[in-house]
């Protein structure tokens, strides 16, 4: 496995705090409890058409695992885990089924991409959901201060185009934040401190991978 190989791990967002760097500057960081995970399957070009490792994370009562997953974990020779994901990579020769994956894989990584589920906001208007400026605030506005305004549906085309930004359910989407700096790694506590904010609530499950736009090939 080369140094520039894409690496990834599952973890839990614990929350945000701040630390000080060598020049005594305050750095806002998100603390992620990353792993330990276990390799539950290896996919190769010969058998699956692509290279990837499947990693499993999180404790779960074996009685709560359905039959297909129970058989899958039994075949791999690992205890059942709550969360499973795949990490695609060019070379899987450095991994084997049953191998532990810890936060130490990021020791030589400077930047990461973090994928999680954003906070659900419920039904939101266009100003909050899309950042629209809104309309006039004066008395002449007939109760349309925060409305969308024109939506482009005149006689032609006679309909509203798909994807038109309007009010609706906001959040609870799969979101990836790219090129976040790895500020610190605590291998003993399975913690990775990432500069800035990452998607999701405290306690949410996130996937941390080497950055595709620089971190993995810097």
From Swiss-Prot:
Keywords in alphabetical order:
Ribonucleoprotein, Ribosomal protein, RNA-binding, rRNA-binding
Which InterPro entries is this protein grouped with? Ribosomal_uL3, Ribosomal_uL3_bac/org-type, Ribosomal_uL3_CS, Transl_B-barrel_sf
The GO terms describing molecular function are: rRNA binding; structural constituent of ribosome
Gene Ontology terms: biological process: translation
Q: A Pfam family in this protein?
A: Ribosomal_L3
* Gene Ontology cellular component list: cytosolic large ribosomal subunit
Q: Which PANTHER family does this chain map to?
A: 50S RIBOSOMAL PROTEIN L3, LARGE RIBOSOMAL SUBUNIT PROTEIN UL3C
The job of this chain, per UniProt, is described as: One of the primary rRNA binding proteins, it binds directly near the 3'-end of the 23S rRNA, where it nucleates assembly of the 50S subunit.
Q: Which family does it belong to?
A: Belongs to the universal ribosomal protein uL3 family.
Matching NCBIfam families: L3_bact
Assembly, per entry: Part of the 50S ribosomal subunit. Forms a cluster with proteins L14 and L19.
Q: What is this protein called?
A: Large ribosomal subunit protein uL3
Organism in which the protein naturally occurs? Corynebacterium efficiens (strain DSM 44549 / YS-314 / AJ 12310 / JCM 11189 / NBRC 100395)
